[in-house]
Amino acid sequence: MHQAASHMKKRTIALIAILAALLTACTGKTDYNTTLVQADSLMASRPDSALHMLQGISTKNLSTKADRAYHALLLTQARDKNYIRQTDDSLIQVAVRYYDTHEDAPLQARAYYYWGSLYRDQNDYSGAIDKYAIALSHINDHPGNAELKTSLYSNLGYLYYTQGLNSEADSIYQRAELLAKSQKDTTSLCYTLSQRGMISLTQGKNYYPKAEQQMQQALSIGKAFSDSMVLVPIYHSLSMLYNLMPKPGQALQYARLNYSGLKDTLHCYRTFLLLGNAYFLNGQYDSADIFLQKILKAERYYDTKADACMRLSE
C-alpha cells in the first residue's frame, strides 16, 4: 500500500513537472506573440513606441519561424514609419521568404510593400514598382486590406507618374478613387482626384478642362472637411493649372492660398516659384522679383532655380 502510494506520488510529481515545462514553453511563445501583436497595434498611432518595443526583442528569444518572420516585418515597417532610411533588405527578406512559403496573402502583400518601400528610399523606382505590383497581386481580389491597398495605389500611382507612365498612373489612381469612395476616405479621395488632375494637365491644352474639373472636385471635398494638409497641395496644383491656361487672377489666388497654408514659409522654394510666376502673369513684377530672388538662395532645388532664372531673365 505504501509502495503504491509512493509510486503514485512520483507519477504525480513527474506529470506536474511535464505540465509546468509545457506551460512555460507555451507562455514564453505567447508572451512574444503578444508583444509583437501589441507592437503591430501601435504602428499606426504610435510608431515610435512600436519601434522601441520591437528593438527590445532579441531574435534569439523568438522560438518559431513565424515569430521571427513577423518580427522582421514589423521592425522593417516601424523603421519606415519613423522615417529611418533602410539600405539593407536582408531583414525584410526573412519575412518575404516565410510568407511566400506559407502563402499568407495579407502578410505576403505587406512584406512585399515594405520591400518595395526600401527600394523606393534608395531611388530604385523600377525595383519599387516591381515589389509594389507583386504586393498588390496578393490582395487585389481579397476583400478588406483597404489601408494597405490605399498605400500601394498611392505609391504605385506616384512612381508611375514620376516615370512619365501617365496611362499606368491614371489606371492605378482610378482604382484608388473607387476604393476611397467605398471606404468614405475623403483624404485619399482628394489626393487621388488631385493627382489625376495633374496627369490630365500634362496631356496638354485639350485636357485642361478635365484637369480643372478633377482638381476643383478635390478642392470641394477637401473644403468640406477643412483639412489644410489636404488643401495645400490642391491649391498648388490649381495655381499651376491656371498659370498655364492662363487665368492670372486664379493663378495668384491659389498660389497665395498654398503659401498661407504652409508650415514652413522660409524654405518653400517651389511655392516661391509658383508665386513668382503668378505675380509675373498679373504684371506685378516687383512682387514677382521678390519671390523669385528667394529661390536663388537655395542650396539645392536646381530645377526650381533654373526656372526662376529663366523667369527673371524675362
Residue ranges and their predicted role:
Residues 2-14:
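Bacterial N-terminal signal peptides that target proteins for export
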Residues 14-22:
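Bacterial N-terminal signal peptides
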Residues 15, 26-314:
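A "functional boundary" signal
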